[in-house]
Every structure is written in structure tokens, then in C-alpha cells.
């Protein structure tokens, strides 16, 4: 998923519809149109719903990234008004506004959109909460409406960094948090940073996974993307030295060029239709 602004609005999951922004329980109408119109003015905006055991439909919390902004206890009929104020840079005038320092992980469990999200996401959310409680870690876990890419379920976004992950198994949750504590990406499940463009995310995720396969921890930056054709692009990535830089030099120059091609494959179209194969396309790292 890519956006310049991610907005999560707390709303009980029992009211979510297939299209989250057309949910029930008194959820305000017009947010989908608002999102599309404001995206033209402010860059792409992505609005998702979020739920936990304390969520109700009387008042909502609104979380906005980047920037760690939160609006607490907002009445449903005030949500669009508050969002307008935020994007007018008048957010500090709002009595609802607070600067927020808590770390949050949003996991897609949106079963009404695709059963895979509920089947895999729910378990990971529960195991993750248990692990955090056991380790006494102050990180919030929220269940989210559809984040995109249900074939990668369970999908999640880790904020404030905006790292997205897919196919994270329950067994890998301890090592995921061990890496996180060291400010390391968990490369096997990494899908890219959501604030980067589509091609930058693809390149970054593939290179992190490639480094992992070589036993390396990559500290890299995508410096340039060039689209060659509809089915090919290249990137230039810069690798920054750390204590393992001599090992890097076996595989990379300080700045290296990589090619990606788009390939077709077949897999089930979703957990709703496991017997129906669908032709999909996926980018692959060539060199």
C-alpha cells in the first residue's frame, strides 16, 4: 500500500462493510468522496478503520501518519470537520487534538472484504497481543480494515515508521519484535515502506529480502527509479556501511544497479474461492 497520508479511524469491527468507508452503526457518509477530493490537493490519502476491545461507535479516535497525530473522542458527525481542519494545518486549534507518541501496529482482519484477512490476521493479532503483554512492551495492536494485497495475508503496517509486512506467521512474532527492538526490519515478511512510491517499495523490499538471504543486514536507500517498459524497471540503490560492510562488498558496490521484471503466475483468487485460480503479476529481482 502507498499513500502520503494514512488515516485510521476507530470504529467497531461488527459494523464494517465490504467497503469500510460505507460501514454501519452511524458511520458518517461522504468520507470516500472526501478522501478522493483531498488526495488531489494534498497527495494520496488512505483512510482505514481500526478496532480493538475498547472501540465504540459513540466516539472515535483518529490517528494520522506521518506526524503521529491523534484526535481523541471525536463524535461521528464531527469526523470530516476535524479532518478538514487537520489538512488546513489548523489542527492545534482543535480541542480533540493531541500529539501522540505511542507505537502502533495495524493488522488487517477485514473478513467481510476477504476471508484470508480474518483467517490469518485474527490469529496473528491475538498472538501479538499476548507476546506484548508477556514482554511488557508498550505497543498498541489494532485490527484494521483492508490494507491491500490479501494474497499476502496476514498484512500489517507498523507505525510510526510505516513498514508494511505480509505473511508474518505467529511463530515468527518473537523474532519480529526482537528485530524491531534493534531497529531492524524483519526482511522475510517485509513489503516496503508505505510512504515510498510503488516502485521504490518493490525495490526496497526485494533488496532487503536478498540481503537477508545472504546473511546480511541491509542499510540502504533507493536513489533512482527508471521505468524501462510496462514489464521492466531498474533502480539504483546506495548501501551505507555498518560493522558488516566488508561482507557487503562481496555482493554490492556502494551504489549498485538492479533490474526488475514483471512475471505472471497463478494462485487462488482468495480464501473465498480457493479452487479458482487467478492470473496475477508479480515483480521479480533479476540480478
Show which residues each predicted segment covers.
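Histidine/cysteine-enriched polar flanking segments
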Residues: 1-287
Amino acid at each position: 500500500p502507498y499513500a502520503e497520508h494514512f488515516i485510521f479511524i476507530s470504529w467497531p469491527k461488527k459494523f464494517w462493510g465490504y467497503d469500510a468507508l460505507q460501514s454501519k452503526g452511524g458511520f458518517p457518509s461522504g468520507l470516500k468522496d472526501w478522501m478522493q477530493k483531498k488526495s488531489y490537493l494534498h497527495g494520496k490519502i488512505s483512510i482505514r478503520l481500526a478496532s480493538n476491545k475498547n472501540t465504540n461507535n459513540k466516539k472515535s479516535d483518529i490517528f494520522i501518519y506521518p506526524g503521529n497525530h491523534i484526535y481523541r473522542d471525536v463524535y461521528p458527525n464531527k469526523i470530516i470537520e476535524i479532518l478538514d481542519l487537520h489538512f488546513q494545518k489548523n489542527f492545534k486549534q482543535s480541542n480533540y487534538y493531541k500529539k501522540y507518541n505511542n507505537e502502533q501496529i495495524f493488522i488487517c482482519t477485514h473478513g467481510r472484504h476477504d476471508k484470508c484477512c480474518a483467517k490469518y490476521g485474527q490469529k496473528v493479532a491475538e498472538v501479538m497481543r499476548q507476546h506484548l503483554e508477556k514482554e511488557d512492551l508498550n505497543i498498541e495492536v489494532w485490527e484494521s480494515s483492508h490494507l491491500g494485497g490479501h494474497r499476502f495475508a496476514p498484512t500489517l503496517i507498523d507505525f510510526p515508521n510505516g513498514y508494511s509486512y505480509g505473511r508474518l506467521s505467529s511463530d515468527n512474532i518473537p523474532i519480529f519484535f526482537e528485530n524491531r527492538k534493534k531497529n531492524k526490519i524483519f526482511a522475510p515478511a517485509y513489503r516496503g515502506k508505505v510512504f515510498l512510491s510503488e516502485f521504490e517499495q518493490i525495490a526496497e523490499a526485494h533488496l532487503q529480502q536478498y540481503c537477508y538471504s545472504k546473511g546480511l543486514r541491509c542499510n540502504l536507500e533507493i536513489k533512482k527509479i527508471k521505468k524501462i517498459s510496462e514489464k521492466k524497471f531498474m533502480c539504483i540503490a546506495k548501501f551505507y556501511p555498518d560493522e558488516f560492510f566488508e561482507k557487503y562488498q562481496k555482493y554490492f558496490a556502494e551504489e549498485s544497479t538492479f533490474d526488475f521484471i514483471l512475471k505472471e503466475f497463478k494462485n487462488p483468487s482468495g480464501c473465498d474461492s480457493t479452487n479458482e485460480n487467478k492470473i496475477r503479476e508479480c515483480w521479480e529481482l533479476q540480478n
